[in-house]
From Swiss-Prot:
Native source organism of the sequence: Homo sapiens (Human)
Extent of the WD repeats: 7-50, 51-92, 93-135, 136-181, 182-226, 227-275, 276-317, 318-377, 378-427, 428-475, 476-516, 517-566, 567-627, 628-666
Cross-link annotation Glycyl lysine isopeptide (Lys-Gly) (interchain with G-Cter in SUMO2), location: 321
PANTHER family linked: U3 SMALL NUCLEOLAR RNA-ASSOCIATED PROTEIN 4 HOMOLOG
Localisation: Nucleus, Nucleolus; Chromosome
Protein name as catalogued: U3 small nucleolar RNA-associated protein 4 homolog
């Protein structure tokens, strides 16, 4: 692997927002996740659980409900009283409609997907018809005395259940009238509570309604008679969420204590046809409230205040050992929040509402391999750039020379010129940005910092010439297919001649920057692109996909390289393919053209294309790389993959020069330390 001086950075104080709600789409096997800052993320569970899309948050959009309807249409609602639909191609909000019922606490799509229900602060339940372009208000149901906190349709679509404070209502959909009102027991551990909040309801085909509430109970109701059938006290705190499997043979609930409980419908005796609900498995994968749960055919999904998105596999449902067979926790976004100015040794950190610019520390000390060297000069926090307005930052970038910073929100694009005088820094905003640069999904500077490449949310790729403190728009590449396809990843060649762009359809287009035309399109692949980069000298495009495959494509020759064909013929090591975090960054060594540097959240890897590929019998994570020419045994076992797991969780890693690396880590304990305290539990013997 070689020896590097490594800047080990741990001052990126990034804390993901907590998870508020999730919605699973069985047709597409995708999961929508809403966070407390209003951000909505889309995970493709068929593509190794990759976060393929996201919609940036907004301070006034506290999302309380999320659901899929009409197959691939995604809706959300929140405390601002609006219902929103998302454009999954252009990655923006199609429209927002006021429901005129105050804050919205719950939402559910009908079994047919053609209707949408919302539960409001004023006690109203509103029914909307889903039309091809929008949603249309149909009618109100009988208004209740308190806010509607949870909703569930009967699978036939004829009735709905609505959870409120102290009671559950059953409505007839055709008439909109309440046919039953079931009072929830306020008793908690023998003491009568002031209020009992019904956080979740689930309406089953046989007419059973399952409710979860703030008294720590899971209760079963007969909707035909409006009576309580059975009650389970499972927690000393709120049971906040519930999700039922499509087959209605199991369901999952989440509690404020961080525990997830699995219930299954099992026969009363081995030969009996009669079945009953039994609590079978408790799981403790969270430290804080489990605010939301989902149930896929093969896993229990949960999320909450501790920011983790947890997939717990149901091993009896997993047929073969694959991506679905592993417990996984997703904490960090599958995109890069850090950019680097190698020339000035600067790091730009992206947060939701501000940017931070840091200069790396330095040392004059020397030592042997593995030593930690004392700093002669500490890292400097040079700049804190706060956004104006309620919108989250979508993307940001600092130029390689360190003289430009660009970032974008949903409605505005910002470009700044930086000037350095000794230890002082001055910032000047470039004014009068053109209207077509209103918003960007991805930003990238050329290696010489003279050009800025901007992927707009309308599918166009803009090239901007930078000179002094001004800019000039050179060209715009329009979407190839005629439809708006958001470009999520950009890569530019070091010589500035080639620009690669990857869109939401997993295709990669390569443009000739000098001739301002499309050069070629990389052959389509079934899995999304997670990272890509263009190598110096050869102009080979290296592409990493969510299934852990890595391809090398020759841009001048418009074909895969011989090395890439060899890799696809022989195949990657099975341990490499079983990794559950995507590659998020690729770079190259300036003096070693055969080396590819890449990393995910838990490993840093150098691929040496001059060495043979490891087979499945070879030790992939080889702890003994060759140290000198006489080390014959080690050289015989050497293979192309040199992997280090020292740095983790690893959010960014890149070469500053041929002998220096920078690694940005974010320990999970540091994140948990900044979260609100969890519910205090009494331990035995204390």
């Amino acid at each position: 692997m070689g020896e590097f001086k490594v800047h080990r950075v741990r001052f990126f104080n990034y804390v993901p927002s907590g998870i508020r709600c999730v919605a699973y789409n069985n047709q597409s096997n995708r999961l929508a996740v809403s966070r407390t800052d209003g951000t909505v993320e889309i995970y493709n569970l068929s593509a190794n659980y990759f976060q393929e899309k996201f919609f940036p948050g907004h301070e006034s959009r506290a999302t309380e409900a999320l659901c899929w309807a009409e197959g691939q249409r995604l809706f959300s609602a929140g405390l601002n009283g609006e219902i929103m639909e998302y454009d999954l191609q252009a990655l923006n909000i199609k429209y927002a409609m006021d429901a005129f019922g105050g804050p919205i606490w719950s939402m559910a799509a009908s079994p047919s997907g053609s209707q949408l229900l919302v539960g409001c602060e004023d006690g109203s339940v509103k029914l909307f018809q889903i039309t091809p372009d929008k949603i249309q208000f149909e009618r109100n149901f009988d208004r209740q005395k308190s806010r509607i906190l949870s909703l569930s349709w009967h699978p036939s679509g004829t009735h709905i259940a609505a959870g409120s404070i102290d009671y559950i209502s059953v409505f007839d959909v055709k008439s909109g009238s309440a046919v039953h009102k079931m009072i929830v027991d306020r008793q908690y551990m023998g003491v009568s509570k002031r209020k009992c909040i019904v956080w979740g309801v689930a309406f089953l085909s046989d007419g059973t309604i399952i409710s979860v509430d703030s008294a720590g109970k899971v209760q079963f109701w007969d909707s035909a008679t409006g009576t309580l059938v059975k009650s389970h006290l499972i927690a000393n705190a709120d049971v906040q969420s519930i999700a039922v499997a499509d087959q209605e043979d199991s369901f999952v609930v989440g509690t404020a204590e961080g525990t997830v409980f699995h219930f299954q419908l099992v026969p009363v005796t081995s030969n009996s046809s009669e079945k009953q609900w039994v609590r079978t498995k408790p799981f403790q994968h969270h430290t804080h409230d489990v605010r939301t749960v989902a149930h896929s055919p093969t896993a229990l999904i949960s999320g909450g205040t501790d920011t983790h998105l947890v997939f717990r596999p149901l091993m009896e449902k997993v047929e073969v050992k694959n991506y679905d067979a592993a417990l996984r926790k997703i904490t960090f976004p599958h995109r890069c929040l850090i950019s680097c100015s190698k020339k000035r040794q600067l790091l730009l950190f992206q947060f939701a509402h501000h940017l931070e610019l840091w200069r790396l520390g330095s040392t004059v000390a020397t030592g042997k391999n593995g030593d930690t060297l004392p700093l002669s000069k500490n890292a400097d926090h040079l700049l804190h750039l706060k956004t104006k307005g309620p919108e989250n930052i979508i993307c940001s970038c600092i130029s390689p020379c360190g003289s430009w910073i660009a970032y974008s929100t949903v409605s505005r694009f910002f470009l700044y010129r930086l000037n350095y005088e000794h230890d002082n820094i001055s910032l000047k905003r470039v004014s009068k940005m053109p209207a077509f640069l209103r918003s960007a999904l991805q930003i990238l500077f050329s290696e010489d910092s003279t050009k800025l490449f901007v992927a707009s949310n309308q599918g166009a790729l803009h090239i901007v010439q930078l000179s002094g403190g001004s800019f000039k728009h050179l060209h715009a590449f329009q979407p190839q297919s005629g439809t708006v396809e958001a470009m999520c990843l950009l890569a530019v060649s070091p010589d500035g001649n080639w620009l690669a762009a990857s869109g939401t359809s997993a295709g990669v287009h390569v443009y000739n920057v000098k001739q301002l035309k499309l050069h070629c399109t990389v052959p389509a692949y079934n899995f999304p692109v997670t990272a890509m980069a263009i190598a110096p000298n050869t102009n080979n495009l290296v592409i990493a996909h969510s299934d852990q495959q890595v391809f090398e494509y020759s841009i001048p020759d418009k074909q895969y390289t011989d090395w890439s064909r060899t890799v696809q013929k022989q195949g990657f090591h099975h341990l490499w393919l079983q990794r559950d975090t995507p590659i998020t960054h690729i770079s190259f060594h300036p003096k070693r053209p055969m080396h590819i540097l890449l990393h995910d959240a838990y490993m840093f890897c150098i691929i040496d294309k001059s060495l043979p590929l490891p087979n499945d019998k070879t030790l992939l994570y080889n702890p003994f790389p060759p140290t000198n020419e006489s080390d014959v045994i080690r050289r015989r076992t050497a293979h192309a993959f040199k992997i280090s797991k020292i740095y983790k969780p690893l959010l960014f890693m890149d070469l500053l020069d041929e002998r220096t690396l920078v690694a940005v880590e974010r320990p999970l304990d540091d994140i948990i330390a900044q979260l609100p305290p969890p519910i205090k539990k009494k331990k035995f013997g204390t």
